[in-house]
C-alpha cells in the first residue's frame, strides 16, 4: 500500500524543515504515520491478512526508532511532531 505521489508530496511540504528536505526525521515519521494509518484501515477489513500485519509492526517499530532518535537529539522538535501528528506520548 504505497502512498500516492500527490499525498506524499503534500506530507513532505507540511513537515519539511528546509527546502528540498525529504529525509529529515519529521518527514520520515509523517510518511510512516500515513502508511500506518492506511494499513490499519486495510487490516480492519481483512483481519486474516497476517502478512500485512507483520509489515505494519515493522513500520511501527521503525517510526518508534525515529521518534526515539528525535527525542534524544532535539526534544522541542520531538514534541512538535507528536502534537502535529496527534500521536500519544
Curated annotation (Swiss-Prot):
InterPro entries cross-referenced by the UniProt entry: Ribosomal_uS15, Ribosomal_uS15_bac-type, uS15_NS1_RNA-bd_sf
Entry annotated with the keyword Ribonucleoprotein: yes
GO cellular component: cytosolic small ribosomal subunit
Residue spans of biased composition, Basic and acidic residues class: 1-21
Gene Ontology BP annotations: translation
SMART domains associated with the record: Ribosomal_S15
GO molecular function: rRNA binding; structural constituent of ribosome
Gene3D superfamilies on file: 6.10.250.3130, S15/NS1, RNA-binding
Membrane-spanning segments: none
Highest taxon above the source species: Bacteria
Assigned keywords, A-Z: Ribonucleoprotein, Ribosomal protein, RNA-binding, rRNA-binding
Residue segments, region Disordered: 1-23
Family statement: Belongs to the universal ribosomal protein uS15 family.
Function of the protein: One of the primary rRNA binding proteins, it binds directly to 16S rRNA where it helps nucleate assembly of the platform of the 30S subunit by binding and bridging several RNA helices of the 16S rRNA. Forms an intersubunit bridge (bridge B4) with the 23S rRNA of the 50S subunit in the ribosome.
Complex formation: Part of the 30S ribosomal subunit. Forms a bridge to the 50S subunit in the 70S ribosome, contacting the 23S rRNA.
Protein name from the UniProt record: Small ribosomal subunit protein uS15
Organism expressing this protein natively: Desulforamulus reducens (strain ATCC BAA-1160 / DSM 100696 / MI-1)
Gene this chain is encoded by: rpsO
